[in-house]
Amino acid sequence: MTSHPRDAPQFYLTAPSPCPYLPGQHERKVFTHLVGRRARDLNEILTQGGFRRSQTIAYRPACETCRACVSVRVVVGDFEPSASQRRVLKRNRDLVGQPQPNRPASEQYALFRRYLDARHGDGGMVDMTVLDYAMMVEDSHVETHLVVYRKRGPDTAINGRGVGAPIAVCLTDVLSDGLSMVYSFYEPSEADRSLGTFMILDHIERARLLGLPYLYLGYWVEGSRKMDYKAKFGPQERLMPQGWARVG
């Protein structure tokens, strides 16, 4: 009989379901639980191996006939923003991101709901309640925090805090070799700001200031318009069967 160490992770496989990225495809995921004293170390190892975190679950695609989902991470030390990305930074000079503990707030959920209703009305998260949101944010056994973006105020240069309602929010994991953007959302009425791009650019700079070599962006899916934007942040590394390979 095969025995397993008491704290060894157990992996499970989901049933097939429609792929949210490629029409006509079906997805399956392999997943394990991130709980207990080894959760942080396990999250490190699995993220570096192409997994993503959702609450206390780490998962990666395990589709039978498709390998389109590719883990990507930005090489922070070599990144230089493009002309269009510099324009995004300029448009958002009036914003400041403040790291804070992963505690949910009603103003965050209100923004989250507006974002889902405007951008992902047919997605799997559209029915999330305030309790679901709270669990997404605070149900974690790893090192994580929120970065909440607000407009700059008269005292921002002194205290680093913005004013007014949040305009964008990112749930961010801290790893030994980088930051991982777990989930982000933003004010849909501020589309001209390109807030999704701005948060990635801001997190690249945060990783740089922390001396971390990578920013993990999750999966890039060739042929999916939803994921095209991730290819614009280079140089980056993509996880291939032989390991991480540099692109750009």
UniProtKB/Swiss-Prot annotation:
Q: Which reaction does it catalyse?
A: N-terminal L-glutamyl-[protein] + L-leucyl-tRNA(Leu) = N-terminal L-leucyl-L-glutamyl-[protein] + tRNA(Leu) + H(+); N-terminal L-aspartyl-[protein] + L-leucyl-tRNA(Leu) = N-terminal L-leucyl-L-aspartyl-[protein] + tRNA(Leu) + H(+)
One GO BP annotation of this record: ubiquitin-dependent protein catabolic process via the N-end rule pathway
Instruction: Kindly list the GO CC terms recorded for this protein.
Output: cytoplasm
Classification via SUPFAM superfamilies: Acyl-CoA N-acyltransferases (Nat)
Q: Give the top-level enzyme category.
A: transferase
Does Oxidoreductase count among this protein's keywords? no
* UniProt entry tagged with the keyword Transport: no
Q: Which UniProt keywords apply?
A: Acyltransferase, Cytoplasm, Transferase
Role this protein plays: Functions in the N-end rule pathway of protein degradation where it conjugates Leu from its aminoacyl-tRNA to the N-termini of proteins containing an N-terminal aspartate or glutamate.
Listed name of the protein? Aspartate/glutamate leucyltransferase
Return the EC number.
2.3.2.29
One annotated GO molecular function is: leucyl-tRNA--protein transferase activity
Query: Which family does the entry's similarity section mention?
Result: Belongs to the R-transferase family. Bpt subfamily.
The entry's localization annotation reads: Cytoplasm
**Which source organism does the UniProt entry give?**
Methylobacterium sp. (strain 4-46)
